[in-house]
């Protein structure tokens, strides 16, 4: 807005986001998680209806995790879990039933992978799983759970991700890269906005902080973003490099003034 544009933010499902870009209803989608969204996004990209602009977040994670004290005790891989079945009560704590993460855990159990055939996945919710973790950590009770980053859990708890679950969660600790997508032709029609979008990349630390402010402290998203950019002028400078206001003015002072 400080650059002179009038953006509109719509919260929609992933399939609707891609159909909307194809139909010119939406211009930009910042949440193309790959490879998990490949089956949805790739057909639009292959047909030339959507363009993949830039990777805006790298090294995201999604796999099993433990408190740091459990990791320090020698449980660093999913291969170490069965050896400590008693401490873990043969339970892997997940989130809501039917979630893809829970389904992957159940598949591990069904396959008797890593010696986990007689374990069980505990269906709960994100809040319920983290409440259980909060209750166990003060007494250093053992627990293995579904973890992911970015998420405030990474700053609220000392935790570590378990290696070697590649066959189920994928390589690099269930690694994902998030891309910015645009409707085909948008960058050519709005090159200045395209420059901004190309510059807008995020880090895990940044997103963990922002999500914690919003989810744990109740800060409004717009206010959380404003606070972060005010405290990190280097990020703002990098995002606005080569960008002008809509009428061709200097972008940086315009945005700094709005902050």
Set out the residue ranges of the language-model regions.
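Pocket-flanking alpha-helical
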Residues: 13-47, 131-132, 152-157
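A conserved helix-loop-strand patch within extracytoplasmic ligand-binding domains
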Residues: 47-97
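Ligand-binding pocket segment of bilobal, Venus flytrap-like solute-binding proteins
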Residues: 26-30, 97-166
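Extracytoplasmic/secreted envelope proteins and their assembly/folding machinery
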Residues: 18, 78, 102, 106, ...
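C-terminal functional modules
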Residues: 200-259
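Ligand-binding cleft/hinge of the Venus flytrap
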Residues: 1-5, 80-120, 230
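A bilobed periplasmic-binding-protein/Venus flytrap-type ligand-binding module shared by bacterial periplasmic
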Residues: 61-71, 175-189, 212-213
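C-terminal lobe and pocket-closing loops
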Residues: 150-201
